[in-house]
Amino acid sequence: MKKFNCIVAGICLSASLASAETIEWSAGSLGGGWYTMSAGIAKIITSENQDIKIKVVPGGGTANPSKIQKNRSQIAMGLDTVSYLAVNAKGMYGKKHDKVSLIGQGLSDQILHVVRSKDAKYTNIADLLTKGEDKRIAINKVGSSDELVFRWIMEYYNTSYADLKKRGFKVVHGSYSEVASQFKDGLVEYAVVKLGVPGAAVIDMLLSRDGEVTTLPADLMSSLKKNWGYNSGTIKKDTYKGQNKDAVTGNMSTALIASTDLSVNTVYKITKAICENEDKLESIHSSMKFFSCKTATVDASIPVHPGAAKYYKEMGYIK
C-alpha cells in the first residue's frame, strides 16, 4: 500500500511539474543590477508558486517593451518613462505596444542630477540653455537615457546641440567616471547624469569641487510629464556635500512590466508573492530598500495589469 501511495504521489508531482506555466523574464545585462534583481525576485515567486517556472534572460531598458510586445518574453524589467513611450508609440517606438502593462514600479529610482559648480553663472538649467554663451557641460553618453532626457529639455527650451555650438557651448559626452573627472578638473561647469541616490559619481564631483544639484523648473517638469511621461523625484538636502536644500528633479523609476497575454490569476500570484516578501528585496539588491507595494502604482505611466490590480485592490492600495 505504501509503495502504491508513493507511486501515486510521484505521478501527481510529475503531473504538477509538467503543467507548470513557464514564463520568460527579460532582465538587464548579465552581471548588472537588473539581472541580479530579476533572478532574486523570480526565486521568491517560484518558491511560493510551484505551478510557475521562470526563465531569466538578458535584456535591456529600451529593448524589453518590444520583447513583451512580440511575446518573446512575458515579464521584463523596464523604466516607467520608456514603457510610456512604447505604449504610446513615442520616441524610438514607431508602433503602440498595446501588450505592455505594469505590475509595479519604484523598485529603484534613477534620479536626474543637474550639477553646477559654485562659481557657474547660471543657477538653473532654464537660464543656462536660453541665455548662456560659451558654457561647458558634461553629459552621459549619446543614446543613454540620461542624454535622451537632456534632448527633451533642449527641445522644451527651443534649442539643440547645433544651436548651443553656435553660442560657443562645449558639450562633452562620456561615462559617469569621465563626466565626474571633467567636473572635478574644472573642465566643465555643469554635469548631467541620471543615477540612484546617492550617486557615486556625484559624490565624487562634489567632494572634489564646490557645487550643488539644482532643481528643475516646474513648467519644464510639467511639460516632461505631459509629453514623455517623465515623473519627478526629490534629492533630499544633505544628500551631497553642499546640498543645503531639497532639489526637485526628474526620475525614471525601475518598473516590472508584463504582457497582457498573461492571465489575471498568474499575475495576481506573482504580485502577491512579491508584496508578501518585501522584506527580502533589499537583501537581493540594496536599491530595492525603499520599494513598497502600497505605492507601486502611484503616478503609473502605463495601464496596470488586471492581475496586479486585483491584488492591490484587495489590499486597499488602489480603489
Which ranges hold each PLM region?
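Bilobed "Venus flytrap"/periplasmic-binding protein-like clamshell domains
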Residues: T22-E48, I52-K55, I111-D185, K294, ...
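Divalent cation-coordinating acidic motifs and surrounding scaffolds
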Residues: K53, P58-A76
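Ligand-binding clefts/hinges and TM-proximal coupling segments of bilobed small-molecule sensing domains
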Residues: D127-R151, N231-S301
